[in-house]
Amino acid sequence: MMTAGHPGQLADAVKLGHRKFPTGVTVVAAYGSTGPVGLAVNAFSSVSLDPPTVMFCVARTSKTYASLLAVDRVCINILSEDQSDVARTFAVSGGDKFASIRWHRGETGAPVLDGSAAYFEAILEVRLPAYSHEIFLGRVVASSTEPGKRPMVYYDGSMHDVDGHLLDGAR
């Protein structure tokens, strides 16, 4: 078991600890003044059902961060286990991430990624600074699930299916 005594060691221990906590894989997408923008996010959670509210966190160093500050409508796409290529596309900076994937504009105008296991369209109502990140709270105004689609899971630095199998090409 790894424990840490000073700040550098503590940061490494915390990173390793987070790798042991499985999360879903989401793409937060918005339609801004220059077109669609998006990024992969695993810091996502339900906050409330009354009213339906979700949250996600974005690093302030992300190239998508400024675009998200400029919009008030987003779509949080829960990726399915057959979308590892989509996850890789949105996990890197730069380029037209929407050129190689199928998507459409949802009820709010935000990009909905075709083939996702589920999605939540939300109106951003609260933005909270949190050290190196920003916490976004959004009131859900539309949501859908795709029957038969299973979510992708991220843990130990890799993408897996819900049975724990490493996804093709994932790392």
Predicted regions and their residues:
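Basic, polyanion-binding surface patches
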Residues: 1-171
